[in-house]
Amino acid sequence: MVRTKIFVKEDTKMLYTEKEKHEIERVKEVFAEHLRQSPDFELLWSDKVGYVWLTIGVNPVYVDTGIRIESAADLCGRCLDDVATDVLYMTGNDHALEAADPLELAEIKRRWELYINQLPDYAYLCKDLLDGKM
């Protein structure tokens, strides 16, 4: 068996600026309880690529796709989308967020309010999600 050693340059580009990482961690803290209890994903730190949104399942146990979190807005959008998806699952309707009925929309907006009150700079993401732009 031939082993290949992979060299990593010490001067590789920083994953996030200090400001970007701080803002991602602020969003992570606001959504901490939601992130902790979700059975559908895990937010992990990698020294190689930064934060990774990992799609998982717990029954049955599986690991699916991993997506690198590019920014605080990226993380916030994914979390808001997951909150909305929880409402759609709760109502038993199998449709996209853009097709949510008025009662579903009211509940989604009510749940989003908890987070957006703490992260007002990201309120525009709610409209983007509802308009199918994300």
Go through each PLM region and give its residues.
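Intrinsic disorder/low-complexity segments
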Residues: D11-K13, E29, D74
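Positively charged, low-complexity intrinsically disordered regions
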Residues: T4-I6, E23, V27, L35-Q37, ...
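Acidic, low-complexity, intrinsically disordered interaction modules
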Residues: W45-Y124
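Short, Lys/Arg-enriched N-terminal segments with co-localized hydrophobic residues
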Residues: M1-K13
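Negatively charged, low-complexity tracts enriched in Asp/Glu with abundant Ser/Thr
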Residues: L15-W45
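Intrinsically disordered, low-complexity peptide-like regions
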Residues: K9-D11, A32, S38, G57, ...
